[in-house]
């Protein structure tokens, strides 16, 4: 096929000459900006196009100006924004050529300059990119909040509040953002953000919570590895009720009439998938105990489920638990380990998530969060208080003005409410965490070891300022006869726990453990009050949208 301006070979040679010219201009880094070079290339292409046309197979899939810029040019390495803005000496990066990729947070264009803040999620703060020149500003106008972009340029000293910024040389819109994007530059309520849980990690609050959650999870694994614990994966589907409360989600493949009949018959689920009743686990503790009685010190860390119809800001239907179990251990050693874990994980958050914590302190912590966390991580040992003594001090305090309390009736055998727990930690113990231990046996679980007084069990709760109960643990009952008797007392069938009783028959040892509500830990460290905002996709009564 012949072009209007000459033969096909001549056309191709002209294109090759144009390509060589543009390649030289890019590789030599001429003074013109990329945006100006791109504009020049487009103009040259238009001029060439007026003189000839290409055969169908030779047509370019995209504009020559976009295709040619990468020819023979090695792109600089991509850097995560965290490695730039949180570098120990950001000024040392001045002169570095790099590419950043992320999402546009803010876009501002002036007469001679344009500013684009890009955040890639690796850090709280984004990186400001500066655009100069008419061509660059024209490109920038195509970017809106929420667009995914890639920006290549050189790190330079900033004339603004930040130490450095990126002087943009190229801009690519990787993914555009349609009108109606719900996360415009304004403050949104946490309740609204739960309705768009798939987009809310792009906000400051939920991104900070997610990074803190990641940091705390990694710190948890690091702590137990250093302490010599083995990580055990406990089953999600179980036939046992660890808590004996019966608030469990049933797992079944039956439906309709078959399910209705099975629920009313003894052994009615023998035709079900598992040939018996099965549930989502409420705890990995019982499974962890079996491994502790073979491997010494172990822990589980995973999701657990409870079909409790609770709409409070402290409860979820699906939540994560850290559950260590230690063989040849007593309640004292369990409390020691829980204290060390909490101090270690909080220290890691303070060390690695400073910007996120400062944000949380400003918007959720009443400017006291950092001080409180530092005090917990590096301050005095946690207070230890017997339950009976806790009841005494509470009764004395409540007697001063019962009207100030939602639950003023406290006596031995009362299951402490959140207001009681918080007063003990925040006021009575001066803002320190406190272990309350030796609880009445009637309000604790069947597997907890009876004390010699016959009234209490070797159980503890760790109460933290601001949240109340954070950890619950105990020394486990290792005596077969007493454990079996308590099962009957609590309305459980020992036959359902035959394997758990076997641990006491074959080489039984004293052992202890605890459970730490991981989502509550995230709330405690971030000062975010509602537990539904501590987890990516919260599950609670009436809500499993995503």
Regions found by a protein language model. Give the residues of each.
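Generic, well-ordered alpha-helical scaffold segments in large soluble proteins
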Residues: 103, 215-227, 283-286, 290, ...
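Class II aminoacyl-tRNA synthetase-like tRNA-binding/catalytic domains
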Residues: 72-329, 523
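Metal-assisted phosphate- and nucleotidyl-transfer catalytic regions
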Residues: 241-268, 340-464, 486-509
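Short coil/turn segments at secondary-structure boundaries
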Residues: 182-184, 213, 230-237, 293, ...
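Intrinsically disordered, low-complexity basic segments at termini and long loops, enriched
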Residues: 1-37, 417
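TRNA-recognition modules of translation machinery and tRNA-sensing kinases, especially anticodon-binding
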Residues: 275, 279, 292-303, 312, ...
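N-terminal plastid-targeting presequences
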Residues: 63-70
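N-terminal chloroplast transit peptides
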Residues: 30-57
